[in-house]
Every structure is written in structure tokens, then in C-alpha cells.
């Protein structure tokens, strides 16, 4: 599975994942909205929005 792994609004980069899912975490801090992308479907703390999906580059 190919997942996107760029941070926030950086140009898209991808990585090959052994997991069968990709994730996208979104939260806000003093710098504004932050986005983290990667492989798998991690646990997140309250207040962080998590989207997981199972197709190539679905977490862009």
C-alpha cells in the first residue's frame, strides 16, 4: 500500500507501507492547523482528528 507521508501543506511525498491502512491526523496549535500523514491507524489523544483509509494515497 502506498501512503502519503508529507507534513501539513508540504508537497506530496509517499512511502510504501506494510500496513493495510494509511492515516491522516489533524489538530490545531499556535502555528495553526497541523496535519501528519503516514502508515497504519494509530491511537490518538482527545482533540486530534484521525482519518484512516485503505487505498493508495488515500490520506493526501
Swiss-Prot record:
It comes from the Eukaryota. GO terms for molecular function: acetylcholine receptor inhibitor activity; ion channel regulator activity; toxin activity. CDD domains: TFP_snake_toxin. The keyword Disulfide bond applies. It is found in: Secreted. Disulfide bonds join 3-22, 17-39, 41-52, 53-58. InterPro entries: Snake_3FTx, Snake_toxin-like_sf, Snake_toxin_con_site, Toxin_cobra-type. Binds to muscle nicotinic acetylcholine receptor (nAChR) and inhibit acetylcholine from binding to the receptor, thereby impairing neuromuscular transmission. It holds the Pfam family Toxin_cobra-type. Its main location: secreted. Expressed by the venom gland. Belongs to the three-finger toxin family. Short-chain subfamily. Type I alpha-neurotoxin sub-subfamily. One of its GO terms (cellular component) is extracellular region. This is Short neurotoxin C. Keywords: Acetylcholine receptor inhibiting toxin, Disulfide bond, Ion channel impairing toxin, Neurotoxin, Postsynaptic neurotoxin, Secreted, Toxin.
